[in-house]
A protein has these predicted regions:
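A short beta-strand/loop micro-motif in the catalytic core of glycosyltransferases
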Residues: 121-122, 143
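Short, thiol/selenol-centered motifs that function as redox-active sites or metal-ligating centers
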Residues: 123-127
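Glycine/proline-rich loop-helix segments at beta-alpha junctions forming the active-site rim
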Residues: 146-148
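Extended, subdomain-level signal for the structured scaffold at the beginning of enzyme domains
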Residues: 1-118, 129-139, 150-198
Length: 198
């Protein structure tokens, strides 16, 4: 099975969960996927941003190139086969907004991805925080989240499903960063056509 020619975008910020991100870097590469780490630049260059990202568990600097999702045009967005919101504190940092009457830029980006049914959306563990400002994205959909976020998911109108990985159409959710291997496997299976759940 191969994901050659498929682009996968992973949102990234400080306090990422190192084992999860390292796993994705290697596992998706094994399937020949083109991996892109996407973030809000906060007015900085890619090199400055990447150098400033530290992991959650071991405080290890991020080792990768970071691209901006801000201002991404529709054609570029549609070129992605999947967009993943990882575990750790990534989503909490990305959901910051200077204007509390507007959606955070990262949530706006997630809304745009949800509007494109051709894009597989993956949200794992605390990644669900990024959808909290736009609960309509998951309302009425089956999801799994970290145990600490079950109340949040239910308050967003999602249908909590007690499984390690849950698929609801073009949405794949995972319980914790520790389940990243099962989560990635499901995404690979769907994108490669092995799993027809989407």
């Amino acid at each position: 099975m191969s994901l050659k020619g498929k682009k996968i975008g992973i949102l990234i910020e400080g306090d990422y969960y190192e084992p999860e991100i390292w796993y994705y870097k290697h596992r998706f590469a094994e399937e020949d996927a083109e991996l892109h780490f996407l973030s809000r630049m906060w007015g900085q260059t890619s090199a400055v941003m990447a150098a400033g990202f530290k992991g959650h568990e071991y405080k290890i600097p991020f080792d990768g190139y970071v691209e901006s999702f801000e201002g991404m045009d529709d054609a570029t967005l549609r070129s992605f086969a999947a967009i993943i919101v990882p575990a750790g504190m990534v989503s909490d940092r990305l959901r910051y907004t200077e204007d509390i009457d507007k959606l955070p830029p990262a949530t706006e980006f997630l809304k745009r991805a949800f509007a494109e049914k051709s894009i597989l959306k993956g949200i794992i563990c605390h990644g669900m925080w990024l959808a909290a400002p736009a609960p309509e994205l998951v309302r009425g959909r089956k999801v799994v989240v970290h145990n600490n976020l079950v109340g949040d998911a239910r308050n967003m109108g999602a249908i909590y499903t007690n499984q390690d990985v849950v698929v609801d159409g073009d949405l794949v959710t995972g319980r914790t960063g520790g389940h990243c291997h099962q989560f990635a496997r499901k995404i690979i299976d769907i994108l490669s056509g092995v799993d027809k759940q989407k």
